[in-house]
Amino acid sequence: MIVKTNVKLNLGLSVLRKRADGFHDIETLFVPCYDFGDTLEIITGDDYSRTSAALFAKYGAPAGHFDASTISATDKLSDLQKALVGGPVEPTELSKSAKDEEKGADLPGNVAASYDGRLVQGISEDGKLMITIAREEGVDWDPLKDLCAKAYNILAQDFDLPPVKIFLEKEAPVGAGLGGGSADAAFTLKALNELCGLGLDDQRLSEYASKLGSDCAFFIFNRPMIGSGRGEVLEPYDINLSEYEIKVLIPEGVAVSTAEAYRGIVPREGLPSGRSDRLGEQKCLPEDPCASEC
């Protein structure tokens, strides 16, 4: 199964208060945005992948699977290739090549990466999940900790899932507040629900999604929603944006961690006395370019 994910926009964001669990209570309007998205393929272990050959060819590795001549972890890759074909395999540690040692790379066990870092592949310790992630700008995270892998694992806690292979090509900007990773997780949940015949409705899927990330549940419904709580409490909202052209500007090479962004916020309850926090009551500052229009 191959799906194209999308991202989301927040049309307004009000940070109300910091919670005891470390999250923030917010109010926001989520709307889907189809200008950006990733390509996700999920197949059972013995199915043929239409994505793998294209990914490996595009990112410099041979079609099919990794090869010792192009991959930093060398002598155990045949085990990765065999994984999921006949069911779970024994966990195996991947050794690092001399070139990789020179670069000081620190590969987790069971994870292989291309020399240029644009493609990584990992297999879970029980051998039931193989995940491959490709990104033009490089993949600097453990694929087994990606939200797609976490989506598989959270369903596997309650259901007897078959071994699967996940192929993900990251094209949506990372660290841009667009929810690309959350979308990948939500679409993984929906795909596994269909592939494995789990019979979960959107409400049940959203409950799983909310455990993976604050805005993951939105992508289960993928329509305009008012988000509250930490973003997982959703209420449908009718809005027609067809007459508007929304431009999304993303500075090249700039990525902001959501957690870091929230750490720098003073919630509404922390505003100085007398200060307005409503957008409609904001006044332009003298140095603001719009001051002459106010």
Enumerate the language-model features and the residues they cover.
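ATP-binding N-lobe of GHMP and related small-molecule kinases
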Residues: 1-174, 194-199, 203, 251-254
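Gly/Ser/Thr-rich beta-alpha loop segments that engage phosphate groups in nucleotides
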Residues: 14, 24, 177-183, 215, ...
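Short clusters of hydrophobic/aromatic residues that line enzyme substrate/ligand-binding pockets
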Residues: 26, 139-141, 174, 178, ...
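DPxDG-like acidic metal-binding loop motif
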Residues: 176-202, 218
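Glycine/threonine-rich beta-strand-loop-alpha-helix active-site module
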Residues: 198-238
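Conserved, helical-rich catalytic subdomain that frames metal- and/or nucleotide-binding sites
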Residues: 221, 226-294
